[in-house]
Every structure is written in C-alpha cells, then in structure tokens.
C-alpha cells in the first residue's frame, strides 16, 4: 500500500505538534502571550516546516527578518530561525548554531572587540564560525564528536577501552601534543592507530585510551583551523 506524501506530511505535522505541546505546553499555559521561537532541525526539510538557509556572509541581527512562521491547530504561532549555508569552495551548512552565535554576540556586548573573532561550538558536529562585527563571514564543520563515537564503538580501537565517567586530563593532553607535534604531520588516520599500539604496550590504561583518542582528534581539528584561519 502506498501512502500519499500529503497524508504522510499531515501525520508528521501532528506528531511534531504533539511533541511541542508535551515539551512547552505548561510554559505556554502559564504565559500564553510569550513569543515562540524555534531553531535547529525543526526547520530542516525533514522538520516541522522548512526554513530555507541564508547565505553567508550574513548580519546576524538581520536573521530575524527571515523567520518562517507556522500556526498550530490550537492557534499558536511559531517562528522558525533559518540556518546558514556557505556556498562556493565546499558547501557547508548549520542549523541551530546560528542562534547560539547570535546569543554569544549579544552576551559579548559592546566592550568586546568583535572585528575578528572565531567562535567555536563543540558538539557531535563541531562548528567554527568566523565573525566580523555582527556578521558571520564563514564557518567550518568538523565531525569530531561523531567520528570519536564511531571509532570507539565500531573499530578495533574500542576493543581495549574501558568506559569511565572520569576525565583523564594527562591522556587527553598527550593526544593533543602528539597531534600538534612533528608526528602529527603524518595525519589523523596514522595517528589514531597509536591508541591500539599504546594499549598493547602498556602505554595507556584502558580507562585513559578514550581521552587520549579525543585529544588526538581535537588536536587535528585545531591544526586544520590554524592552517585555514589566522
């Protein structure tokens, strides 16, 4: 049986609305006049309502003029913040991080010199945005967090690791130093195998290996930033 796309979208919209009411219903009940803003994947092509990307460079204080509006079945109006896209040398996108960047710019205030700033947003897909004044001029994405999880869970590197809630700063720093030193020039694909070799030669304990790998990956991320941004 084929499901008509229009019917599928209607069902998806109802599911989004139900989730929205569960998450925000009590807030809106207490303050019904509160404006509703949403950002992130809710505005993607697979989200509740698509909010088309804005091209960079873009003044972040102009983003509010490009909100996408939708109305729920109960009459609530939701405004969705658009993501950003960089076209040209290699297409790059962000959704949700643009709102965090705007918050950072507001938090900095007039006392901070924003003529040339690099804003880092760590996460599964880390973003680094080059900002001048109130405008996002360019940005990069690094899949550091997701690659770390994949290496730990789906490669031989994870076989000797022991998950722990403790942070082993010395192991992390060791990974950073190796990535940013002469050996780091061999590249991340070569360096990460040292997690395995240190495990086999008692160079790292099972508890330290994850933080060491994290340091390696973050170190190579920073190396790339240094190569492309002053």
Labelled PLM ranges:
Residues 11, 15-19, 95-99, 142, ...:
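Conserved active-site and cofactor/substrate-binding residues in soluble primary-metabolism enzymes
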Residues 1-15:
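Short glycine-rich, Thr/Ser-proximal phosphate-binding strand/loop in the N-terminal lobe
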Residues 25-91, 133:
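Short beta-strand-loop/turn "lid" adjacent to the catalytic site in phosphate-handling enzymes
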Residues 20-35, 108-112, 222-229:
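Phosphate/pyrophosphate-binding loops at sites that engage ATP/ADP/AMP, CoA/4′-phosphopantetheine
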Residues 156-230:
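ATP-binding/phosphotransfer module of carbohydrate and carboxylate kinases, centering on a glycine-rich
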Residues 8-11, 85-118, 122-181:
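Glycine-rich phosphate-binding loop plus the immediately following alpha-helix
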Residues 2-4, 60, 226-230:
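Short, intrinsically disordered, charge-balanced linker/junction segments flanking boundaries
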Residues 37-42, 122-124, 230:
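Glycine-rich beta-strand-to-loop/alpha-helix junction loops that act as flexible
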